[in-house]
């Protein structure tokens, strides 16, 4: 995150017009998390590393596209740093339950240290090191600045899953 911060500072100090988006999990049919969960579902079991109580705040890729288009066309986004987050915070466990709703897929928790060991040993592990770090980092935001500037009605996870038939 230090390199991202340094890059932001370079942009801010450049004198250029900017809008910096700090993205949460961006979900769509082909994002990493969706693909990882879908792949696990085909095997009949979804693994939750650790307790699953850590939170995420996913945002729909369609909402992201609309917000970026708004930012390009509206000056009110100028010289802003915005947390690009969805409308709801939820635990990873609740996200997985929603994702697997109405299926016969089992949910199984695994020791977090074991998940990290597997990610270090196996480049094809279900969750990579970066994904684990982001997941357990519990990164959320109040999203106030985004709500204040954007006219986009953010899609809830349930709405997104239903409309995309991801679950």
Identify the residue ranges that each predicted region occupies.
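Short, flexible active-site loop motifs that bind/organize anionic cofactors or intermediates
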Residues: 54, 85, 105, 136, ...
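Oxidoreductase cofactor-interface core, primarily capturing Rossmann-like NAD(P)-dependent enzymes
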Residues: 1-103
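Structural motif detector for alpha-helix initiation sites
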Residues: 61, 92, 112, 143, ...
């Amino acid at each position: 995150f230090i390199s991202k911060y340094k890059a932001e500072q370079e942009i801010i100090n450049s004198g250029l017009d900017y809008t910096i988006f700090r993205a949460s999990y961006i979900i769509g049919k082909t994002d990493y998390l969706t693909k990882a969960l879908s792949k696990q579902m085909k095997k009949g079991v979804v693994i939750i590393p650790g307790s699953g109580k850590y939170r995420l705040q996913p945002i729909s890729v369609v909402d992201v596209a609309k917000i970026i288009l708004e930012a390009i066309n509206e000056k009110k986004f100028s010289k802003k740093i915005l947390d690009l987050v969805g409308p709801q915070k939820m635990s990873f466990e609740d996200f997985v339950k929603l994702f697997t709703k109405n299926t016969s897929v089992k949910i199984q928790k695994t020791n977090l240290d074991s998940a990290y060991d597997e990610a270090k040993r196996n480049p094809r592990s279900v969750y990579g090191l970066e994904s684990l770090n982001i997941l357990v980092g519990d990164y959320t935001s109040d999203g106030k600045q985004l709500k204040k500037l954007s006219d986009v009605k953010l899609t809830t996870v349930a709405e997104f899953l239903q409309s995309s038939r991801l679950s």
